[in-house]
Amino acid sequence: MLDYNIMAKSSFKLKILYGEGDAEILASQADSIQKAGHQVTTVVGRRALEQALKTDAFDLVLLGPTLTRNDRHHLPYMVKKAHQGTRVLVMHADGGRHPYVDVATDTGRSIESILETIASMMAQEKLVTAQ
């Protein structure tokens, strides 16, 4: 089990845009991400996510498994077009590698596993920028 207090004290706090197709799943997952110390903006559906990208910039965009397959395919392009440096994590991989997705996870991974993936991704990025 992930210790949220340790995660909250990490050296980075990300500004995350998290989109799902299901509001209940979105609420429970977003709560866990906030407890890990990140600032989370939540949206339900593709149009709301597109609108959020027009009004603000984010460090990371999470595309949840309850978004449609079509949305999970097209939204990474839209994210990178709006903000090239924003990282994209798709929480339900459909197989092949998407050129605009920075990290993809398999279906059914726990939120703790997703948080570990985010921490690992950011630690790698920190190492690269420090060189």
Describe every region a protein language model picked out:
Residues 1-21, 32, 109-131:
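Non-catalytic signal-transmission and effector/linker regions of two-component phosphorelay proteins
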Residues 17, 41-42, 87-92:
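Short, hydrophobic beta-strand segments that form beta-sheet elements in well-ordered domains
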Residues 22-41:
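Two-component/phosphorelay signaling modules centered on CheY-like receiver
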Residues 23, 44-48, 109:
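Acidic phosphotransfer microenvironment of two-component signaling modules
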Residues 42-60:
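Acidic, metal-coordinating helix/loop segments flanking the phosphotransfer/catalytic sites
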Residues 54-56, 79-85, 95:
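Conserved phosphotransfer cores of two-component systems
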Residues 61-83:
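Conserved phosphotransfer microenvironments
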Residues 69, 74, 89-116:
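Alpha4 helix (beta4-alpha4-beta5 surface) of REC/receiver domains from two-component response regulators
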